[in-house]
């Protein structure tokens, strides 16, 4: 007996639901706790036993006067911090960085770990690094996605003395718009395995040809991520947007005016809600792109960071303070916080 139209609709709906369920975005969060987290032989070993490559650039001439923990961006890995770390080392600052889950040489490369798992790793690594350097000023630095995750970790009580936010990924769903957000959700649930491109490399993330060449040749760069990895990134940016108004530490927030990946509109939306503090700065670089620390003027940015660590109330040496480069954004800063 042929099926009625109603039965066909019900079966089609059920089949569609099964297909969507079977193709949900892949998330590989941290597993059960099996040990105490530790830094061992160039690795960060998490509480669930996951082992992630870890790097350190030691301060020149002995004990550091400050320590920076770097959190890399989407598709990147620990070596994102190599160039600025050399400048900071010469200034007496030690830098640490690791490959986050899903990136670099991590065992789950190409799979999203979940915002809370990634933020949890930041909290754990920060505790371990802080324990290595008791009494030394300690800063959490994040680039792009790393900046978003740094905001989330700070909101969850990361034990640091300040935040350094570089080209922070703040393109939350409310700034992407319903079409882009809906399209991403559709593809992430229907074909989560689909590799997407072009990646940030093809959107000219820097004006530095040497950096571009290194990115193209480096096998550790994730060039064609799955669409569900991008869906996870948006989740992280949503969480960062929610966390941004609650920053309770000094912070240095830097963006390039030539950034094609994180345009000014999402930045404007976030800074209007962020606390305006005398020990914090907004900086905008006229010739800056997305990878500020690896641009042609990367050393200028790295030295601004050193200057801020030394004196948080003084203007940045480069003149990048928003009051000089983008006074309208300086005026917007903290303007929508209310009472």
Question: Which residues does each predicted region cover?
Answer:
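An N-terminal hydrophobic leader/cap segment in hydrolases
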Residues: 2, 14, 18-46, 50-60, ...
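The serine-hydrolase catalytic nucleophile loop
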Residues: 74-86
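Catalytic nucleophile-loop/oxyanion-hole region of alpha/beta-hydrolase
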Residues: 75-78, 104-134
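Conserved alpha/beta-hydrolase
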Residues: 85-108
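Alpha/beta-hydrolase-fold enzymes
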Residues: 141-226
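Short beta-strand/loop motif that positions the catalytic acidic residue
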Residues: 247, 253-255, 259
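Short alpha-helix in the alpha/beta-hydrolase fold that links the catalytic acid
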Residues: 249, 263-273
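Catalytic active-site module of serine/aspartate enzymes centered on a nucleophile-bearing elbow/loop
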Residues: 281, 286-339
């Amino acid at each position: 007996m042929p099926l009625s139209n109603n039965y066909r609709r019900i079966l089609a709906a059920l089949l569609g639901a099964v297909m969507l369920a079977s193709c949900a975005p892949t998330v590989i969060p941290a597993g059960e706790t099996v040990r105490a987290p530790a830094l061992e032989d160039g690795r960060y070993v998490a509480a669930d036993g996951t082992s992630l490559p870890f790097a350190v650039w030691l301060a020149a001439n002995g004990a550091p006067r400050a320590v920076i923990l770097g959190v890399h961006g989407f598709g990147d890995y620990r070596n994102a911090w190599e160039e600025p770390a050399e400048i900071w080392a010469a200034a007496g600052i030690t830098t640490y960085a690791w490959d986050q889950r899903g990136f670099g040489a991590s065992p789950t490369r190409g799979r999203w770990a979940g915002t809370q798992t990634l933020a949890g790793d930041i909290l754990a690594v920060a505790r371990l690094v802080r324990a290595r350097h008791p009494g030394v000023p300690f800063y959490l630095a994040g680039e792009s996605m790393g900046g978003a995750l740094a905001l989330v970790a700070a909101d969850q009580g990361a034990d640091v003395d300040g935040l350094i936010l570089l080209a922070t990924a703040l393109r939350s769903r409310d700034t992407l718009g319903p079409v882009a957000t809906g399209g991403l959700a559709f593809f992430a649930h229907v074909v989560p395995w689909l590799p997407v491109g072009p990646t940030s490399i093809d959107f000219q993330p820097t004006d530095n040809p040497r950096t571009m060449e290194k990115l193209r040749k480096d096998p550790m760069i994730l060039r064609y991520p799955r669409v569900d990895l991008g869906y996870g990134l948006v989740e992280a940016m949503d969480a960062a947007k929610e966390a941004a108004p609650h920053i309770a530490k000094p912070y240095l927030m830097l963006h390039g005016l030539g950034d094609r990946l994180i345009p000014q509109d999402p930045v404007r939306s976030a800074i209007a809600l962020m606390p305006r503090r005398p020990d914090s700065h907004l900086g905008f670089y006229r010739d800056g792109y997305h990878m500020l620390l690896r641009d042609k003027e990367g050393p200028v940015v790295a030295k601004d960071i050193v200057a801020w660590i030394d004196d948080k109330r003084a203007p940045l040496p480069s003149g990048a303070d928003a009051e000089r480069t983008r006074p309208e954004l300086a005026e917007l800063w903290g303007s929508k916080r209310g009472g």
